[in-house]
C-alpha cells in the first residue's frame, strides 16, 4: 500500500491507514498548514477578507458561511483552532442580534460576518444560562387552586411539623397534661356520682 502524501504539509505519512490519515487531518500542524495554503491562494488572486464577499456576490456569500474553511477568513470569526476552544459548539455566524439573511446584503456596511455595529450588544443576553428566572415570579408556598382560594401564598406554620425537638416535646407534655386532666375530671365525676348515690340510700 503506497504511503499517503499530504499536499498541505508536504510530507508522506508514516502510518497510511484511514485512522492515521484522520488523526493527521485533525492535527494542529495540518490545520494551520491548510489555512496558510488557502490564505496564500487568496492573496495571489488579490482577495482580502475585506473585499472577499464583493468578489463572490450573493451566492458566494451564502456559500462562504456554509464552508468552514472560507468562514475562517471572515473578520470576527474564530480560526481553525476553535476545536480547542471550549465555545467551539457555539454557532458564531448568528452572534450579532442584527444579523439577517437577505439578498443584496453584501452591499450593506454591516454585512461582514462577525462585524458588530457601534452601539449594539456584541454578545446578546442569554436567558438560558442565567441563574435568574426570566419572569422573576416567586412560587407560592402552598398554592391551592380552587374557587375558594383561601390557602394561596400562606406559609405553613403548623408546629407539629417543625423539626425542632423541643417544640415536639412540649406538645407531647401538653397532651399528657390534657390527658391527665381528663382522667382526674373523670375520677371526680365518678366520686361525685358515688357520693350522690350514697346520700340517696
From Swiss-Prot:
PROSITE patterns in UniProt: ZF_MATRIN (PS50171)
Q: Where are the zinc fingers (Matrin-type)?
A: 4-36
User: Which domain of life does the UniProt lineage start with?
Assistant: Eukaryota
Any stretches that span the bilayer, and where are they? none
Entry's SMART domains?
ZnF_U1
Q: Which Gene3D superfamilies match?
A: Classic Zinc Finger
**Keyword set includes Nucleus:** yes
Map out region (Disordered) in residue numbers: 137-176
Q: Name one GO biological process term.
A: mRNA 5'-splice site recognition
Where does this one sit in the cell? Nucleus
SUPFAM superfamilies for the chain: beta-beta-alpha zinc fingers
Keywords assigned: Metal-binding, Nucleus, Ribonucleoprotein, RNA-binding, Zinc, Zinc-finger
Annotated Low complexity bias? 137-154
Q: What's one GO MF term for it?
A: mRNA binding
Question: What would be one Gene Ontology cellular-component term for the protein?
Answer: U1 snRNP
What does the UniProt record say this protein does? Component of the spliceosomal U1 snRNP, which is essential for recognition of the pre-mRNA 5' splice-site and the subsequent assembly of the spliceosome. U1-C is directly involved in initial 5' splice-site recognition for both constitutive and regulated alternative splicing. The interaction with the 5' splice-site seems to precede base-pairing between the pre-mRNA and the U1 snRNA. Stimulates commitment or early (E) complex formation by stabilizing the base pairing of the 5' end of the U1 snRNA and the 5' splice-site region.
Q: How does it assemble?
A: U1 snRNP is composed of the 7 core Sm proteins B/B', D1, D2, D3, E, F and G that assemble in a heptameric protein ring on the Sm site of the small nuclear RNA to form the core snRNP, and at least 3 U1 snRNP-specific proteins U1-70K, U1-A and U1-C. U1-C interacts with U1 snRNA and the 5' splice-site region of the pre-mRNA.
The similarity annotation says: Belongs to the U1 small nuclear ribonucleoprotein C family.
The protein's name: U1 small nuclear ribonucleoprotein C
Origin species: Plasmodium yoelii yoelii
Amino acid at each position: 500500500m503506497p504511503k499517503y502524501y499530504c499536499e498541505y504539509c508536504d510530507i508522506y505519512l508514516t502510518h497510511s491507514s484511514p485512522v492515521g490519515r484522520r488523526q493527521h487531518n485533525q492535527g494542529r500542524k495540518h490545520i494551520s498548514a491548510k489555512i496558510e495554503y488557502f490564505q496564500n491562494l487568496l492573496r495571489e488572486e488579490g482577495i482580502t477578507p475585506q473585499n472577499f464577499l464583493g468578489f463572490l456576490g450573493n451566492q458566494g456569500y451564502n456559500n462562504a458561511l456554509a464552508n468552514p474553511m472560507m468562514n475562517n477568513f471572515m473578520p470576527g470569526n474564530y480560526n481553525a483552532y476553535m476545536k480547542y476552544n471550549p465555545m467551539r459548539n457555539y454557532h458564531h455566524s448568528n452572534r450579532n442580534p442584527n444579523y439577517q439573511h437577505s439578498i443584496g446584503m453584501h452591499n450593506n456596511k454591516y454585512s461582514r460576518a462577525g462585524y458588530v455595529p457601534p452601539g449594539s450588544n456584541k454578545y446578546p443576553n442569554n436567558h438560558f444560562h442565567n441563574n435568574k428566572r426570566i419572569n422573576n415570579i416567586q412560587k407560592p408556598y402552598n398554592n391551592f387552586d380552587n374557587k375558594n382560594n383561601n390557602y394561596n401564598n400562606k406559609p405553613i406554620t403548623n408546629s407539629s411539623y417543625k423539626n425542632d425537638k423541643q417544640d415536639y416535646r412540649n406538645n407531647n407534655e401538653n397532651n399528657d397534661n390534657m390527658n391527665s386532666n381528663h382522667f382526674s375530671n373523670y375520677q371526680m365525676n365518678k366520686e361525685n356520682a358515688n357520693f350522690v348515690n350514697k346520700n340517696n340510700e
